[in-house]
Amino acid sequence: MEKKTIIDLFESSVKRFPGNPFLWEKTGKRFEPTTYSKVRDLVYEEGAGLVSLGVRKGDNMALLSEGRNAWIIGELAMFYAGATNVPLSIKLEEANDLLFRLVHADVKYIMVSGQQLKKIRAIKDKLPAVRKIIVLDELAEYQDREMPLSEIRRMGKVYLGIHPLEEFLAIGQSLGNDDYATITYPSGTTADPKGVILTHRNYTANVEQALTCVDIDDTWRTLVILPLDHCFAHVVGFYIFMSKGASVATVQVGRTGMETLKNIPVNIKEFKPDLILSVPALAKNFKKNIEQGIRARGKNAVRLFNLALRIGYIYNGDSDEEEGKGFRILLKPLVRLFDKLLFAKVRENFGGELKFFIGGGALLDKDLQKFYYALGIPMYQGYGLSEATPIISTNGPRRHVFGSSGVLVRPLDLKICDMDGNVLPPGEKGEIVIRGENVMAGYWKNPASTADTVKEGWLYTGDMGYMRDGLLYVLGRFKSLLIGSDGEKYSPEGIEEALVEHSSCIDQLILYNNQSPYTTALLVPNKERLRKHLAHQNLDLTSDQGREEAIRIIQRQIDRFRKGGDLSSMFPDRWLPTTFAILPEPFTEQNGMVNSTMKIVRGKVEKAYAARIAQLYTPEGKNPQNKWNKEAL
């Protein structure tokens, strides 16, 4: 079998595109490029420094940093030294979360940014196996076992001055397809997350697979706005672009995490990317900002914008096969006019060169997809998971259908199975099971979970879906299906998305039914919107009358989905919440209720609010006008 490691991929691109800009970074007033050949020089220097430090083939190194050139160069340098990267999320705030990963992964060396160093220092005494902590930024002083990256580079120069280059390169070239590249810990899956082992060939295979769905050329640029520890950001964010000689930028690092987030829209506009990776939470924020900008122009602008959207929705239909076809062709002049008057100006806020978004992390609401498509910057939904490196399918310029997760990457085998593992015919819903070179090597030091998840080369994803007309439709977690008292199973995610999307006074919501007499919901209200509604009736949330009316407002918004409501055709009544619990605080990363992609961690929410769920199945709790809901408001 031909050897195709990440090092091979990188060396091939440097050879073909030496003068192309590879990495872009903004530390001052503008983004500055570093070419492929220059990045290679820096990688050699740093990799040789790691070897000089004592890093050996098979050692595990952790990387904890904001997105920046040093992150990508650092990972490549690890590979040239023969090491495996354990990328860590900067959103890990709890010392125990970091400590578990570092100890569980047998980490010997840590690369860390100056901003994140305090987290390592807080647990350093509990990490006796860690030999050195390499700080990516220059500090006034360093503590025990700490050293600056500049010293590693100095050591690398000395090493390369003494040893033949071929001797150093032989270390990286000794890596094979099955050697480990990363051990990633997807957040929010269990109390002690599993370490997903991805090999060099897992990554290069998924790059090849993804390029069967999306075309990229060497002039393209992307700004990676997702955390680099995600394998989604790894594959689509820089390895696909690297394979094509294209350019990768990272968001300007602020003094705080919030400042870095605020830099995202500014950086997008100035860097002018061709493609951006997104997750639903970011997509919703972008949409919210666009709508706020339109409202700021006055009521006439809002009416015109909404009219333009409606016409765009009709013209585009639900897929590329419907777009502009049949009677829709009559709308083309209007679509072009509105695009010139309105949507082109919106696109300028994304730099003016953006071709499309690729969405991952969680399912994108269908209405959200239609919104961006009407603007002329499609947000194509893809599907994958860390254990598949991660891409399994995606919509794209070649083919898209709103609501689907697109066509399968190639080559890849997929089957849909029932709960007993029997293969189901096309169109029937069951667990998505895949086989291909992108399937992980296993879970680190967890053979039992590996055996449960990968069977004879087939990865059991734990997600529910079906195939239709060559497209994959993902319905949600197979293992988080709600089960009615009659044994009927249904996926909650689509219902939850719709309830939040169409209910202005509900910010977050999860459904619950575990063979219970009826479905219930735990929800986080939008108190600001409730106050505005109440103000029209001279009420507020401080009075009993105001709180009772607020609960009625939420109930009415849910009732829109019931028989007689304007959204009644979307879901069966029995799947909708009979009653609901209003929660006193939102689901956040800080309280552990959402993961780093802003996806609600159902198990943690259910555990934290077990008593509240039990109350919903009492006579008092079944009535939404209960004391607990009033207290929460």
Language model features: what each stretch is:
Residues G19-P21, E151-Y185, D192, D215-R221:
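Conserved pre-ATP/AMP-binding loop-to-beta segment of ANL
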Residues F22-R68, L76, E93-L99, P148-R153, ...:
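Conserved AMP-binding/adenylate-forming core of the ANL superfamily
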Residues P33-S37, A181-V207:
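Conserved AMP-binding A3 loop
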Residues L53, Y80-G156, D559:
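Structural core segment of the AMP-binding/adenylate-forming
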Residues K118-G176, I290-F343:
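ANL superfamily adenylate-forming
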Residues T204-R221, L228-F343:
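Conserved AMP-binding/adenylation subdomain of ANL enzymes
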Residues N422-G427, E431-G484, Q625-A632:
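Conserved ATP-binding/catalytic segment of the ANL
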Residues Q508-Y512, P517, R560-L633:
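Conserved C-terminal "lid"/linker of ANL adenylate-forming enzymes
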